[in-house]
From Swiss-Prot:
Physiological role: Component of the eukaryotic translation initiation factor 3 (eIF-3) complex, which is involved in protein synthesis of a specialized repertoire of mRNAs and, together with other initiation factors, stimulates binding of mRNA and methionyl-tRNAi to the 40S ribosome. The eIF-3 complex specifically targets and initiates translation of a subset of mRNAs involved in cell proliferation.
HAMAP family in alphabetical order: eIF3m (MF_03012)
Cellular component terms (Gene Ontology): eukaryotic 43S preinitiation complex; eukaryotic 48S preinitiation complex; eukaryotic translation initiation factor 3 complex; eukaryotic translation initiation factor 3 complex, eIF3m
UniProt cross-references to PROSITE patterns, sorted A to Z: PCI
Quaternary structure and interacting proteins, as annotated: Component of the eukaryotic translation initiation factor 3 (eIF-3) complex, which is composed of 13 subunits: eif3a, eif3b, eif3c, eif3d, eif3e, eif3f, eif3g, eif3h, eif3i, eif3j, eif3k, eif3l and eif3m.
InterPro entries (alphabetical): ARM-type_fold (IPR016024), COPS7/eIF3m (IPR045237), eIF3m (IPR027528), eIF3m_C_helix (IPR040750), PCI_dom (IPR000717), WH_DNA-bd_sf (IPR036390)
Organism ancestry: Eukaryota, Metazoa, Chordata, Craniata, Vertebrata
GO MF: translation initiation factor activity
Name used for this protein in its record: Eukaryotic translation initiation factor 3 subunit M
Subcellular location: Cytoplasm
Length: 374
């Protein structure tokens, strides 16, 4: 990748120009190059670059891109410390101090490096941190498949893998990207093992609460399979999740009556919980029954007779349930409902359906052969 340079001169002259520029901005730095070589010059230049990050003139962008371009031409073994130092400077700049420039500089550095260099991890983490402070997460790559590939390419340790995923999750949350954040959190929790699951206790707790809060999250059984979530078994938060996964509204109401303070401490809205549990309960009813009377719905979902039809219309809008209202007979005719859990029983049902299709297709094929032979 070609990175913009400060001036088209030799690396040594470029370093000298940068020194002079920084000194003119008030930095405590010598105008003379170091005898130790370019990497020593860059270390001193990066240490003094704070002064120009506060300015708003065009020379700032040129000078900082020049620093980036010089870092990129160094041998890999000399880059790492400089990259860490530069990233630290760009991240620590106060909020509001040219975040778009800092993002651009980090992006130039990130994309200018060889794709397999582990030091890209440091730059990517810095990108996430800066993007989070200015709501600029949309300007950096966050696709989970790509992040997985980078984690593999950089051969990250388990700890560093957790760091980058946690940073990405928090940045997505801060930038109101709840759907993407939820996927990243599941990826993070899924990377823990039985040996270290206890370390993710707080992350698992956050994941459950955010899933319960999300008005569009209805299928939560996959969370129970995550090892850090399993580690919470026996705690109220795990009991609450289990209710949202497979229990009825009545179970939630009983839980709330016994643990109101706990629900409030999580920042959950009881009214929103009731609304979600009504839909989840209705989904379960629709799986087991092709026809459901208004009276049954009213009783199971604890609502007034005048609320039933509006509820059904809202339920259909979620696309979790497909049904029609029979106003004459005061009932609902179900055509399809999404299973709240997908376990062994559901796999067996799917197998039976596919096997039936296979047998029917074979019958059709044999019939066509018989006709053609005749």
């Amino acid at each position: 990748m070609s990175v913009p340079a400060f001036i088209d001169v030799t690396e040594e002259d470029q370093a000298a120009e940068l020194r002079a520029y920084l000194k003119s901005k008030g930095a405590e730095i010598s105008e003379e190059n170091s005898e130790g070589g370019l990497h020593i010059d860059l270390a001193q230049i990066i240490e003094a670059c704070d002064v120009c990050l506060k300015d708003d003139d065009k020379d700032v962008e040129s000078s900082m891109n020049s620093v980036v371009s010089l870092v990129l031409i160094l041998e890999t073994d000399k880059q790492e410390a400089l990259i860490e130092s530069l990233c630290e400077k760009l991240v620590k700049s106060r909020e509001g101090e040219r975040p778009s420039l800092r993002l651009q500089l980090l992006s130039n550095l990130f994309h200018g490096m060889d794709k397999s260099i582990p030091a890209r991890y440091t730059v990517y983490c810095a990108l996430i941190k800066v993007a989070a402070t200015c709501g600029g997460i949309v300007y950096i790559p966050t696709d989970l498949d790509q992040v997985r590939k980078w984690i593999s390419d950089w051969n990250l340790s388990t700890e560093k893998k957790h760091v980058v995923l946690r940073l990405l999750y928090e940045a997505l949350v801060d930038c109101k990207k709840s759907d993407e954040a939820a996927k990243v959190m599941v990826e993070l929790l899924g990377s823990y093992t039985d040996d270290n699951a206890s370390q993710a206790r707080l992350d698992a707790h956050k994941c459950i609460v955010r899933a319960l809060k999300d008005p569009k999250a209805f299928l939560l059984d996959h969370l129970l399979a995550l090892k850090p979530v399993k580690f919470l078994e026996g705690e109220l938060i795990h009991d609450l999740l289990t209710i949202f996964v497979s229990a009825k509204l009545s179970s939630y109401v009983k839980f709330y009556q016994n643990n109101k303070d706990f629900i409030d401490s999580l920042g959950l809205s009881h009214e929103q919980n009731m609304e979600k549990m009504r839909l989840l309960t209705f989904m379960g009813m629709a799986v087991d029954n092709k026809e459901i009377s208004f009276d049954t719905i009213q009783q199971e979902l604890q609502m007034g007779a005048d609320e039933v039809e509006a509820f059904i219309i809202d339920a259909v809008k979620t696309k979790m349930v497909y049904c029609k209202i029979d106003q004459t007979q005061k009932k609902v005719v179900v055509s399809h409902s999404t299973h709240r859990t997908f376990g062994k029983q559901q796999w067996q049902q799917l197998y039976d359906i596919l096997n039936t299709w296979k047998l029917n297709l074979n019958k059709v094929k044999n019939s066509l052969y018989s006709i053609s032979d005749a």
